[in-house]
Amino acid sequence: MDPIAFSIGGFQIRWYGIMIALGVLAALILANLNCRYKGYNFDSLIDVFLISFPLAIIGARVYYVVFQFQDYRNNLMDIFNIRLGGLAIHGGIIFGLGAAYIVSRYKKMDFIKLWDCFAPSIILGQAIGRWGNFFNGEAHGGIVGYEFISKFPLFIQRGMYINGDYYNPTFLYESLWDLIVCIILVYIFRKKHKRGTVICTYVGLYSLGRFFIEGLRTDSLMIGHIRVAQLVSFIGIVLSISFFVYLKGRGKRVD
């Protein structure tokens, strides 16, 4: 699979960047629809997004480089080249949420209400962005036989044929899981729910899916023998369950 979509004056435009851009566009469209449905101010959400998204990208890169520094030790300038991949979603989520919290506090906005609205958009963007990994030939699982890969569409088979072997398309599993979670989150958001339910569901369900899918991957970031994404996902599941217990007793219901 050619990772380069086209070139302009010798400058290569890669599918990885295109898929991230499409994910952002889809996320903003869905956020606008959700704001209209609830009567929220979309402009306020955009104000937060314009600050938190760039910091999320930086966080995703920093997170990846920290755990994969051996790849950059001899050429530190490569740290700034994200066109070939190397963005960790967990880092983006942590930095993005942190930035959004600070901005929302500064602007005296309701952080929980804000992210209840935007959580479906985040997971939709992730679902689309995962296809950038497909074009880069990364975020896949181990070697599989033709009998297994033949069950997938032909373009998936071709994309997962790398250096003479077929690989398990784990990026596809996560993308589909993210779409399912997105549908669930939109449904919850548009019904009456307790404040914080949507973002809590996002953290819990995404972490649950990522925990199991990560176990199939061959390029996981590691701490010793522990997969970092599985560790963070486990923490996310625990936090989500804890917050649901809190919501059951004290959360406020919103329209």
Curated annotation (Swiss-Prot):
Q: What is its EC number?
A: 2.5.1.145
Q: Which BP terms from GO are recorded?
A: lipoprotein biosynthetic process
Keyword Oxidoreductase among UniProt keywords: no
User: Keyword DNA-binding, does the record have it?
Assistant: no
- The organism sits in which domain of life? Bacteria
Record localization: Cell membrane
Entry-linked HAMAP family: Lgt (MF_01147)
Q: Which family does the similarity line name?
A: Belongs to the Lgt family.
Q: What is this protein called?
A: Phosphatidylglycerol--prolipoprotein diacylglyceryl transferase
Tell me the organism.
Clostridium kluyveri (strain ATCC 8527 / DSM 555 / NBRC 12016 / NCIMB 10680 / K1)
